[in-house]
Amino acid sequence: GDSFLEKSPSDYITSGDLQEVAKWNSNILMGQALGTYSTTFAMNSGGTGGHDDFGQKSVDIATDLMSGDMVIMSQGYGWFEAAGSLTCTTTTAVNYSYQFWRYYYKLIKATNEILDAAGGDEVTPEGEENQIYYAQAKALRAHSYFNLVNLYARPYAEDKTALAIPVYRTQLTSEAVKKSSVEDVYTLIVKDLTDAIPLLEGFKRPSGAKDQIDQSVAKGILAYVYLTMGDYKNAAKLSQEVIDSKQYTLMNKTEIINSGFASVSIPGWMWAIDLTTSNSPALPTFWGHMDLFTYSYAYAGGEKLIDTELYNSIPASDARKKWFSEYNSKGEQYELTNWWKF
């Protein structure tokens, strides 16, 4: 008899479904790509539901705290405190290992689905628009694997033969794969980005928007990768290409103090999301945790301060020292919080 089980359920879409739809609707890659970018700033993208789980910037805050260059002024709220106390890598009782893993593999799954719909990650699709979203998927997948291999494996320069993380290049199979070596992960990262860069030639984002990856952003990501691999020549070459394109301008010492880095319209910003009340909540955001003038955690005792030794190592002639300098009417310096950086 007939089965009551749906062969193609309507409550989610598979890579196979995307492949079929893409044959007659070229906009499917665009829709999937734009939806994937929203994961980079979505609350609970790491699956914990906490106020320190909101995509890429939550990873950035946690890893800055783990570096020791930034500290939390006082504890009590709980958010980011395991990172601030440097205990998140010594116990499984905190969510960070799960959160970061889940966040990046969620992005990898989404980018793989785009690549599957385009015919696979070894075949460049036809059509300029499809090539753009194919290239963006490759660049975002590379960015995700780059962060994963840095978080969960040995440094490339220290032991590139060490086992690192599982590498998935398609969602057309659910079969689990074994860990790849650090070197193999980096090989895929470099390939994805070098495949993406020429396909993004001439791509212009909608006016005022910087959420999508363009060619300069892809080059910037690859420059970071080369730096981590110790390939300083190629890192410098790519960085110079971005500067020479004049698509983005280097900020002067006045702009870095007065701008507050608060707007995506700042010419120096290459890749950014404009957070608004319509696309993000108030408390669990980058601003809520980092901006002293936002009525949230940073305002109410959870300030993030620069480490004293790092602050003291900044020459007085360096304008960036003013980010962390504020004095009261008696000439006494307040705590080293980021008064004028955001």
Please describe what each predicted stretch is.
Residues 236-342:
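Hydrophobic-face positions in mid-chain alpha helices that act as interaction patches
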Residues 1-60, 239, 301, 310, ...:
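Membrane-proximal, proline-rich intrinsically disordered regions
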Residues 11-17, 56-59, 154-161, 202-284:
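Short, surface-exposed recognition loops and adjoining beta-strand edges that mediate ligand/DNA contacts
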Residues 151-183, 187:
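Short coil/linker segments at helix-helix boundaries
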Residues 130, 182, 210-211:
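Short coil/turn linker motifs that delimit alpha-helical repeat modules in TPR/alpha-solenoid proteins
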Residues 74-152, 198-202:
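Conserved, well-structured interaction surfaces
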